[in-house]
Amino acid sequence: MGKLIDIPIVVESGQKYKTSQGVTAIKDGIKSSGQDHERLPKPKWLRIVNHTTPAYSQVKEQVQKHRLATVCEEAKCPNISECWSHGTATIMLMGAVCTRACRFCSVDTGNPHGWLDAEEPENTAETVALMNLDYVVLTSVNRDDLPDGGANHYAKTIRAIKKRSPRTKVEALTPDFQGSERDVAVLLDSGVDVFAQNVETVERLTHPVRDNRAGYQQTLNVLAFAKKYRPDVLTKTSLMLGLGETDEEIIQTMDDLRTHHVDILTLGQYLQPTKNHLPIARYVTPETFSELRQIGLKKGFFEVASGPLVRSSYRADRVFKRDNLGLDV
């Protein structure tokens, strides 16, 4: 009798499957609609140059060795080769299954039923130390199945990083914790340097773009509380363009963010990850991104990173230092 061969099962986008923890999840977050929207032709300025360097291989090796999920992979980020080739990565905590289903995001959706990797804080700290990072971005899926939304897990991870790598700056791109100030405070007391929570889109488009449990005002309130509670911590948010918003709505969102004391803003082009996700309404030109950056700076943002391929954590270390060279062209 011949030897049995393990054949990997390929899960199609929009289909249900079981994770290694036994969680039922939907691949890429959105159920298959059976429809294929007509896509706008991609403009030449959105061409992505792949970088392959020893640093890229080193980051990939460390991520796999310590069983870390990265938003670079899970969210199909267009900048993965560039960032990894520069020895940086955005680490995604608390697994790769999100309890929410935002219609722009390709992270898998399901209910982890309270599962957490207890070794993740120390594994993450070890990886950051081995990479010798000056700056690290931590993000996560939403974990509405946890009483604190994962705030204590974030805090443990940040403290572990600071203990092993005290000079490393830590940015936390977090869920909204359902607006709980208590949970946000737990994270802010961990020694984090930058607190980020993404508003994602303009107020009018919040409901069709984000999960119903998210809210425009809820995000603004979380960011305002963070600044009030810890004035020394920089606050940050991100806005995707090309979902049907107007330039006037973008500027109004800037005003709302400044009213709520947000320090840093990133602006980037929305890219449709699969045919089941929201279609692209328009491609915003590099010139418009550059103009919006100047408008934002005049409104008093500490920094505005603005460009077609900019994502919330893209070159975050340079944005933190106000070294935004090349991000607005």
UniProtKB/Swiss-Prot annotation:
GO terms for molecular function: 4 iron, 4 sulfur cluster binding; lipoate synthase activity; metal ion binding. Pathway: Protein modification; protein lipoylation via endogenous pathway; protein N(6)-(lipoyl)lysine from octanoyl-[acyl-carrier-protein]: step 2/2. Binds 2 [4Fe-4S] clusters per subunit. One cluster is coordinated with 3 cysteines and an exchangeable S-adenosyl-L-methionine. It is found in: Cytoplasm. [4Fe-4S] cluster 2 binds at C98, C102, C105. Keywords: 4Fe-4S, Cytoplasm, Iron, Iron-sulfur, Metal-binding, S-adenosyl-L-methionine, Transferase. CDD domains: Radical_SAM (cd01335). Pfam families: Radical_SAM. Its EC number is 2.8.1.8. InterPro entries: Aldolase_TIM (IPR013785), Elp3/MiaA/NifB-like_rSAM (IPR006638), Lipoyl_synth (IPR003698), rSAM (IPR007197). It catalyses: [[Fe-S] cluster scaffold protein carrying a second [4Fe-4S](2+) cluster] + N(6)-octanoyl-L-lysyl-[protein] + 2 oxidized [2Fe-2S]-[ferredoxin] + 2 S-adenosyl-L-methionine + 4 H(+) = [[Fe-S] cluster scaffold protein] + N(6)-[(R)-dihydrolipoyl]-L-lysyl-[protein] + 4 Fe(3+) + 2 hydrogen sulfide + 2 5'-deoxyadenosine + 2 L-methionine + 2 reduced [2Fe-2S]-[ferredoxin]. Disulfide bonds: none annotated. The keyword Iron applies. One of its GO terms (cellular component) is cytoplasm. Its cofactor is [4Fe-4S] cluster. Belongs to the radical SAM superfamily. Lipoyl synthase family. This is Lipoyl synthase. The lineage of its organism: Bacteria, Pseudomonadati, Pseudomonadota, Gammaproteobacteria, Legionellales.
